[in-house]
Design a protein with these regions (language model features):
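Secretory-pathway glycan-assembly enzymes, especially type II membrane glycosyltransferases
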Residues: 5-200, 205, 221
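Donor-binding and catalytic core of enzymes assembling or modifying cell-surface/extracellular glycoconjugates
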Residues: 207-272
Length: 272
């Protein structure tokens, strides 16, 4: 029964071509979809970038749909009404879901992420040519909304560049929920103690006086604050403590709106 159910599911959500109207008869649109209610914003960024690259390679105009399936960037009542992607990024090729609502040639993509070789995963750090390709793809199609760009530039100017010549070490730490769950085929960061030791080593080597820390995890934040009192900078205002097995998206969305939380995280990464 399980196998039959999966076959039905895969058939319903297969790649298929539809006609929604007669507009844009000379364009072929590819709607990028993904069903993943536990994946974070940057997981969607990586897989969407891969799907954009593949759609363009096949001669389509990519359009991202993060509206018609639940994801951690939307409140339950926003599903089907708000495209989460458009809150943070510009459309990759200028067209939104709303723009193509009456388009003639539309292909709906499968709801699973691209195969490993079609999206930027950690293997690219071992291949300079692949890294350069994904960097070029991101620069072309991954454009932040102007308001996010302004906040990034403002923080850098007011905080990081306040003292000319001062060196600040940038550090990103994934949450302990990621470390506890140990998702298959994902790289694991060192324990916080090892991160602290490496920070001390790099700060000494390069003469850094402060650390810009990007993390949503309260435990990691507390450990870093204790190790480097008065030296930690961060754009983020809130952090979260997860229990065993709890997803940090759920913990964060319980105290802050998904939009505000993910915008804050996106800006903090942009600053980094």
């Amino acid at each position: 029964m399980g196998r039959i159910r999966k076959q039905i599911h895969d058939y319903i959500w297969r790649e298929r071509t539809v006609r929604w109207g007669d507009e844009y008869p000379d364009q072929r649109f590819y709607v990028i979809r993904r069903h993943a209610d536990q994946a974070g914003l940057f997981s969607f960024v990586a897989t969407n970038l891969g799907s954009i690259n593949e759609a363009v390679r096949r001669g389509f105009v990519p359009v991202i749909d993060m509206q018609n399936a639940a994801n951690p960037m939307l409140l339950p009542e926003e599903v089907g009404k708000v495209n989460a992607w458009d809150r943070y990024f510009l459309p990759p090729c200028g067209y939104t879901l709303e723009d193509i609502a009456h388009a003639k040639n539309v292909t709906l993509g499968v709801i699973t992420p691209p195969e490993d070789e079609y999206y930027p995963d950690y293997n690219m750090i071992l291949d300079a040519e692949e890294l350069a390709m994904w960097r070029e793809t991101a620069e072309r199609y991954l454009k932040l909304r102007p308001e996010a760009e302004e906040k990034i530039d403002g923080y850098c100017e007011e905080v990081l560049h306040r003292n000319p010549g001062e060196k600040v070490l940038g550090v990103l730490c994934r949450g302990t929920d990621y470390l506890q769950q140990r998702p298959y085929n994902h790289p694991m960061q060192p324990k916080t103690e090892a991160v602290i030791a490496k920070c001390r080593e790099v700060m000494k080597e390069y003469g850094c006086s402060r650390i810009y820390l990007c993390t949503e995890d309260q435990r990691i934040w507390d450990q870093m604050q204790e190790a480097f009192p008065g030296q930690i900078l961060s754009y983020q205002k809130r952090r979260y403590q997860t229990e065993s097995g709890e997803n940090i998206n759920d913990a964060g969305n319980a105290v802050m709106s998904p939009y505000e939380r993910n915008l804050e995280y996106l800006i903090s990464i942009g600053i980094l």
